Amino acid sequence: MTERKIIHIDMDAFFAAVEQRDNPELRGKPVAVGFDGPRGVVSTASYEARKYGVHSAQSIAQAKQRCPNLIIVPCRHDYYAKISHQIHQIFQEYTDLIEPISIDEAFLDVTQNKKGIELAVDIAKEIKTRIKEATGLTASAGISYCKFLAKVASDYRKPDGICTIHPDKALDFIAQLPVEDFWGVGKKTLQKMHFMGIFNGADLRKVSEEHLLEVFGKAGHIFYDFARGIDERPVITYRERKSVGCEQTFLEDIYLKTAVIIELYRTVLELLERIAKSGFEGRTLTLKVKFADFTQITRSISQEKVLKKKDEILPLAKRLLQQVDYSSIHPIRLIGLSVSNATSEEARMVDKENSIQKPEYKELELEFEDWET
């Protein structure tokens, strides 16, 4: 059997790099892309900012504490998406087996490539050069025989790096790999692993599959395989959409019923717009509420008919909100709504239609915390 050749391309600090490219005054300075308000969150931080401990998903307030001279630049998502599409077209020069997993990264299966290039590392070098010439941006590339190791490799020599993990070196590489660098290991999983005495791939390899399944559920089987360099997942050219949603963080915490209802209504309208744009139809509505102390809850309700109209979604959203306890001492910071639970046929049709126009970017759902309950 021919060994697969998988490349993972990951743009370096993509949003921040675009802003530094377009504005020479930002080059070499700590930059964060995000909303510069009391509730703002960092979307991407430049490498200069990361040296201070600034990172994505961090509050702007905390980021400024760590880096007082941090420059905040508003996010231009539509603009970044156009550049991402330009990069995707470069990928298509080499293979049609492309799996975008977010706006700034993708897997490519180049086992059989359009240019007949034998070595995957040569393809990766060409792609990096083409991206630099076309956009002025740098990318890091990871190469291996499976997706797990290709992604790990792309992080290994960032920024503007390239790393290959060969099959005969994989087990030794994994043995030394900290478990926090394993795909799918989040904070809760990491805490459990450390409690079990698992700190790297070698430690993980010593644990039986039965015990991993007992502790981590379905994810245990994946961790068992990853520790042995096994990952047979194919590069998927389109990803079945599982949900459509939106959320908003408020400038100030809210607790008055009228204010909460108004914000819920606005969120419903935003959700309806996204449903209309995506063409997705689901049967389950989920409400997400995050409180001022950053604790959060979700409530869901399902029905037989698909949800796509305001008079269908708004009453259900209000019913879900009634299940949430909030008050002046437990105010709300964020409200989110999503629709899920489509038939596979509907979801597949939506993705096929979308893929004709442009690649569908969706974060890989490889954080297994939901399986830990």
Feature annotation, model-predicted:
Residues 1-215, 220-221, 345-347, 354-373:
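Gly/Gly-Pro- and Ser/Thr-rich, intrinsically disordered tail segments characteristic of DNA damage-repair
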Residues 8, 181, 189-334, 339-372:
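DNA-contacting surface of Y-family translesion DNA polymerases
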